[in-house]
Amino acid sequence: MFEEVLQESFDEREKKVLKFWQEGQLFERSVENRKGQPLFTFYDGPPFATGLPHYGHILAGTIKDVVLRYKTMKGFCAPRRFGWDCHGLPVENEIEKTFGLSGAKSIEEFGIAKFNEECRNIVLRYTEEWKFTVNRMGRWVDFNQTYRTMDLPFMESVWWVFKQLYAKGLVYEGLKVMPFSAKLGTPLSNFEASENYKEVDDPSLTVAFQSRDNSNTYFLAWTTTPWTLVSNLALMVSPMIEYAEVQDHVSKRNYILATERLKGYYKDSGEYTIVRKFPGSELEGQHYIPLFDYFNDRAHSGAFKIILEDSISVEEGTGIVQTAPAFGEIDFYACQKAGIDPVCPVDNNGQFTDEIPEYKGIFVKEADKDIIKRLKQQAKVIHQGTCHHRYPFCPRSDTPLIYKTVRTWFVAVEKIKDRLLAANSQIHWTPEHIQYGRFGKWLEGARDWAISRNRYWGTPIPLWRAQDGEIHVVGSIEELKQLTGNPLTDLHRHFIDEMSFEKNGKTFKRIPEVFDCWFESGSMPYAQNHYPFENRELFEQNFPADFIAEGLDQTRGWFYTLTVLSAALFDQPAMKNVIVNGLILAENGAKMSKRLKNYPDPAEVIQQYGADAIRLYMLHSPAVKADDLSFSKSGVELVLRQILLPLWNAYTFFLTYARIYNWKPGKLVQKPELAIDQWIISLLNKLVHEVEQGMDDYDLSRSVEPFVNFVDQLTNWYIRRSRRRFWDDKESPNRTQAFETLYYVLIELTKISAPYVPFISEAIYQNLRSCDMPESVHLCDFPHYQQLSRHEKLEAEMEAVQVTVSLGHALRKEHKLKVRQPLATAQLASADPKVLDFLKEQQHLISEELNVKEITFSSNEKDFVSLKAKPNFRVLGKKVGKLMKLAQLTIEQFGQKELTELLNHRSVEIILEGHPVLLTSEDVQVERIVREGIIAANQGTITIALNTNLNKELLLEGLAREIVNKVNTMRREANFAVTDRIQLYMQTTTRVIECFDQYKNYICQEVLATDVQFGPYEGTDWDLNGEPTKIIIKKSEY
């Protein structure tokens, strides 16, 4: 029944599984089989196909795949439609580089139609590479029904979304200070600007503004953007800060600044004399002489005066802030409140206009040095330095952003903030702290969303404007056809920009802007189904999504735009459950960089270790809890070596002996009688329960960890403890039950592991399944939890045994005693009678594992350990607060009476400053400290002591076990079959020969030796516990 396992790499084996899936159309069938079952809706965030997939995509894709495979196995119909983000700056950047274009002027000279068609040509450049990587990683998605944001139906639905918002009064055109990419010539939204902060050094300048009322008095103002000084229209002070007028002893001038900031400008108070102190409110309305004369005429309309602003700080600077309202959001609102209109002498390339003739055509930041130089010549610079701070860079062009006033179209997010917060309260987040932490706080501080971009390759904003300012919003292709009388085959700019129409005697022309591509991706739930023009019922069944998953950065991206639009349109969230993954960094913790090549090529890692190893490495990492993961090949290799190889070896172990004895599974599996079989089946059911709990709560770490632990228990305990049952040459109920149990466990385990490691699960299942089972493990139902098969008492017993064995092995290691060396006695102590009973019941097993001849038991642990109490600071701190130090001193003085009460889970009362406080075992930890002079170890209620004295008999037996170990190592290295008999030739010492005299039968039985010869042989050199030996093994002919 069972095929022989070939020697091949994980990569080779996985490729065979891929072929099996593709030829059998297993993905399609897995969805088809569940039709008519409850629908599980998933939205896939669309990636750009202009770049290759990286580890971040692989992580998010793996998380999505795990959940959807699991839900399918749980009986849901879970379609998986892939999508492509086709519009936006990443695509435009590629074309600009290809054709040497830079900025709007060069693009328009090139031709918008040609430019857009070039964008269309490259937008799906890497789709085949994406498909290959997605498939090779084992992710099942539907590439045959992909949605694309550049397709006509998708774009039409985006228009519908916009018109709905406009009709609800949630769209307006306004002048605001926005993050602005001079390189791209367009404003960005606040969440885009938050994506790419860098540590930079900018000039720090303190400038003296001369008072118009007193020529010897100067207001000292601070700035880190000297280029904005040419547009200065006001100075801001705080009404709540105290200011001082001081006479400077060197310049003889009077300076005004915050009292608290004097120390930042004077080393010694003897350098100045305080003339007066006063609140900032007294400065309101005072006038000063502008530094430059570019906008002197603005003095007549209220400029060049001091205004009030509560947000001014005295942490740095002077407590007075120079104000250029066109280039700062706070400045803009403060001046607006004071009736001062902004001036913006900076164009869309970030260059000064002819309003500043000396710097016309110069990028603003490049003018800093000359502006500072001019002010120094005028003796206006009081202090010049450098400010090291975080500054936003354009996430697309990686150039520094500026902030400037722009006229743009907004979604009035602030107006519906309460609806966003209500929608968020209905979403289940993993990890849960995202809900009211990173995402919730972002919603609380949400600003109106700038959705228009002065670009070309995107969905045009469907606004037509008459010369008098009247607006007409178009919400469909049919509406535009009726208005213009023109047929429509495409909605991109070069098809509709020139379309105008007459209405009420007015000519309406389209505005030139396109949508922010985040508006398109936020419209995806509607646009992917061309809602509401088609598929109404399909949309209503699929909204909101049951599940989505993306990276932490999407809390300010896709998660945000989905929520804004769904709350605005339908007063509900767009998704019910969200898994947020962390970022994948280079091994040194730095951001992954193609330029620096600081990370391994995913294709190479897949080829070396296989996709399952990468999947499990990521799933069994902090990344599934929104924490960062520093990716390392060694981490992937460790998962392969410690989890997947042991799992595969467990399967091949079973297969080897099943083939040797021609064992076949019966129709009925007998209920296991042996405790170890009952134990592993109980653990298997516990695993089913824990995986279900974690997966149903979308907590992958809670479901993956038990799987990893189970593989360890199966391979390092169950199979190791059961090996001899499989080696039995004669058929017996014991051997049959061992085969039945391991076969059942492996089959069920492949179903549990299938969502996590789909390739190895399929490979094992394919060779173990009988003809009446589903064709693929991925067509199976997820195992059902069987409460009747749980033996929690047995699980607790075995856990106590494993703790004991682990402590014993640690003691042996500490005292350099191999486990192969028998010891005379071990003593086990526990004050917990249940634990002691567990250990007594498993005495034989413990004796074998620890390789000791005799075990004694004691309930008096005080012979081995002393008890000491210490506070559980995390828990107790909430109860006693500032009295923690006093509580700690009291607890550390506890005697036997209090310790006994706590160990028996009873409370203890203490008095703190006259007040009684009741302490429980949660408040206080009782530590067991091994007494001096005893070779012992402790964990929890279990203590073990070893007798490490070795007599001759023990040493000889240990030597016999060492011989068996080395000969079996030679058998494995020679690739002998497990049934091959051997002849043994040895050149050794009299002590080893003496060992054979006593233990020959044992040694020969363990290594399958038919004959042993001693003599002057040249063989493999071994050190057998200090006895130099040469060994030769040969296959026996009989």
Curated annotation (Swiss-Prot):
Q: Subcellular location, in the record's words?
A: Cytoplasm
Q: Which reaction does it catalyse?
A: tRNA(Ile) + L-isoleucine + ATP = L-isoleucyl-tRNA(Ile) + AMP + diphosphate
**Enzyme class, first EC level, given as a word:** ligase
Main localization (coarse): cytoplasm
Motif 'KMSKS' region: residue span? 591-595
Biological process (GO) annotations held by this record are: isoleucyl-tRNA aminoacylation
Per UniProt, the keywords (alphabetical) are: Aminoacyl-tRNA synthetase, ATP-binding, Cytoplasm, Ligase, Metal-binding, Nucleotide-binding, Protein biosynthesis, Zinc
MF annotations from Gene Ontology: aminoacyl-tRNA deacylase activity; ATP binding; isoleucine-tRNA ligase activity; tRNA binding; zinc ion binding
Q: Which CDD domains match?
A: Anticodon_Ia_Ile_ABEc, IleRS_core
Motif 'HIGH' region in this chain: 47-57
Keyword Repeat present in the record's keywords: the answer is no
Q: What is its EC number?
A: 6.1.1.5
Listed under GO cellular component are: cytoplasm
Q: What is known of its domains?
A: IleRS has two distinct active sites: one for aminoacylation and one for editing. The misactivated valine is translocated from the active site to the editing site, which sterically excludes the correctly activated isoleucine. The single editing site contains two valyl binding pockets, one specific for each substrate (Val-AMP or Val-tRNA(Ile)).
Family the UniProt entry places it in: Belongs to the class-I aminoacyl-tRNA synthetase family. IleS type 2 subfamily.
Q: How does it assemble?
A: Monomer.
Q: What is this protein called?
A: Isoleucine--tRNA ligase
Organism for this UniProt entry: Protochlamydia amoebophila (strain UWE25)
The opening ranks of the lineage are: Bacteria, Pseudomonadati, Chlamydiota, Chlamydiia, Parachlamydiales
